[in-house]
Amino acid sequence: MTPRLSFHKYQGLGNDFILVDNRWQSQPCLSPEEAVALCNRRFGVGADGVIFLLPGQEGADFSMRLFNSDGSEAEMCGNGIRCLARFLQDLGIPGRDGAYQIHTLAGRIVPQVRADGLVTVDMGIPRLLAKQIPTTLVEPDEKVIRQPLAVAGREWRVTAVSMGNPHCVVFLEEEGSLEELDLAAVGPLFEHHPAFPERTNTEFVQVLSPTRLRLRVWERGAGATLACGTGACAVLVAAVLEERAESQATVELPGGNLEIRWDPSTQHVWMTGPALHVFSGTTAG
């Protein structure tokens, strides 16, 4: 049973999180097992993960930690950090021009709450070498672009990108195949494939045009979700690497759309999307 706890529920395109104000200590106030109980949609609050707002470190304003619904810890989460920025604003902490320097396990990330309520995030520079993903699909210092991967009795072509967390991107060539994909069956096979020693998030993508992509995602530690911010960023990067898309595109997810831009001059990836407060409460303890 989780201890008595004040919490705040937020969602970004249906990717939902329990936010905990944990600024009074440097470690999360819940164990991974307690986070699992809290995320349970029948016996707990229900969420894809628990996000802890922690004191800043290494010069950042604040720190963020995230336990997935299975108790594993994620290095970063694009939808989650947008929700954290909205949470900070709702706490009455304005930031500098609406921007916050957030320390994560993937490095420093800078979300900014815009005047129109959307949140734009500098997601940093994507990591493309196999050793940075990590994956054993190619040699450590090589990029993973359209490499063959055997899963569920067939060969898939995959491109791997790290946005601070690992992503395996699969472009589906046949019209209608995205909707017909049995994500619950194939997703775990990608996630736990031995070619990804730290497991992986997996995105299945249909290219609608050079500026519009549609995807479904299987998240490492959370399963099928309505949206994945780092996944949307990884998909655009992979689409550019495979010469399927321009450097700025709308990414359609089951929960809604994100605007993603890969700046050719700085190599930084920028994500813009919503983050909304759903409700606040206190657990019984």
From Swiss-Prot:
Site positions per UniProt: Could be important to modulate the pK values of the two catalytic cysteine residues: 167, 219
Gene behind the chain: dapF
Locations listed in the record: Cytoplasm
Protein's name in the database: Diaminopimelate epimerase
EC number in record: 5.1.1.7
Keyword Iron part of the UniProt annotation: no
UniProt subunit comment: Homodimer.
Protein source organism: Synechococcus sp. (strain JA-2-3B'a(2-13))
Binding positions for substrate per the UniProt entry: 15, 68, 78-79, 165, 201, 219-220, 229-230
